């Protein structure tokens, strides 16, 4: 956000340089990304007074003798401009000077006549009409008559100023304005804050009634409006034009400029509706109807749905709430009556609408971070004061203030000085802490028992508890007061990995050997990820912990599954042209015992696998799981279960020792169809996901893995082709075979066949069996007995027949 140094000085008596203030802001938690001097690139440009003029024959040039004070009283400079006269003061760039853009001025001959510099226009100094009147006139910039020759040009034309480009963090929406930063500057310097005038007086009655209603108070907690008649469009005063220009806006008209000025100064977005264009003189704040359309002020048309909040008249939408007004209700030179609007809109709604429509504005940027419910009152009062001060219209007695019914109260935090100091780890004198909090507009009521009842300003919605107060204290007191020390509880160890860390590293190395690359994603996402996986409303995974101060709504909850993050990584790879790959992530998910949370959530370590590409299949993930089982000396069983985000016929649940570990399989077709990737990618891509409870997996591991010596006797191999019902799972057959004989050491599926000769609803599955005895060689008779028993068990339990 851009904040002019000169504008800050209107609210605070600043007695430090811009560079010193930059350092102080940084020490208090505000990152100044850039301190921009307005006179950057300008040197040795001074006020010059034209004392002689002579037309240079045969050319368009005029030879001037210029008085530049201490730099010389008779400097000869030629110019091609024609708008100056004898006695005018103009900017003179002397020999050796520089101008914006790296332009260097040197003495040279022009049409055979020596010229020792250049007389400048406003544009050559980087000025425009809003920054300094006359800057865009064709010709030289004519300076005020009382300008002193030889004076540096910067203070004369207002270039002796700086712009602070400040990065505002998500938890400080109150600082999205010049006044918000001024509050902080006042606290930093210990100076009083001079609030802008907000008084006004209604001077007439409305000429006709207006209806204002809010149908969606959950999305619009407060809506204020005031009717102004007899609008007088005109030009804004120079000071307002300069404020806007320094922040990167051009002046349009006095009334439009007032709305923009209020946004920049107070941080309160506002809009003005031309009542002559509002059907039925009705304003209705409601959800959009499916398929409704609006054309915004920038002449873009959008099709809306009930997820969008709109301002409507009696017939149609006239504004996208919190984003931009409609072209059908904007003011023009014929406007005579306006309804000024200031409101608080739900930031989630504004953000989602802005993203969905691809429509951003200065207003939406502020609403997305949050505008407190007291702000509309201040913003509207300031705008009405300016309307009256600039004589832009007649303020009527008709005003509206519609709320969701919640009282507007300051937050109270009961704490003690010891608690605050305990968080900081240092001792700060009580009175010092009180002074700091009061400078930041908190009130501190010291109780009889020594505790403090601290109330936060209405605009500080980020302050919730005493650690927040501790943060306010230390950023003003100074982080340099905190002396680095070792943690009292820190234990000195010899280093090395513990058992759990070794097991994790073992699993990761095994997966890497299987061709999987490790992914690392954020621990946050949004509820939209659950919708992406088609999770039902009652699914346990939806019981996610919400972040109080999220960076954005896309990162507003703690993850309860890794699969959404893995799927997003796969989609991102596909979008960037990576058509195949294998990925894994081992990270915690955060599970609350109840919501809202009352104790620390369980951080369950989880393993997620992802494979994508035309050549990948179900057995890619299953093979990795089998390798994992072998690595830890385990045996996995697979059962058919339904998972919302997996294909019902190409997925399975994983069990070990009767304990459910997780699921894996192919991404459900309907989810694959909704992915934001090209259609040809959807048709050719195979996306497989798996998610396992790593903690449950490790609970099945019985201490360190013990290895057995290889048997000196070769195993006996047998192949079985079995005909079974389509519903019989491969895992069921494998489990039955293993349990039928102790000689079975390995069962592998190597073929599946379906054909009309098998009968309807039948399939053939072929398995390779290894039969071995560690103490002796298995005879042919023993092998036949084992196979006979296996076939008997398969027929009895599963109805399988030998093919």
Task: Give residue ranges: language-model regions.
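Terminal amphipathic helices with adjacent charged low-complexity linkers/tails
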Residues: 185, 189-214, 391-420
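Glycine/proline-enriched, intrinsically flexible loops and inter-domain linkers
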Residues: 5, 23, 53-55, 189, ...
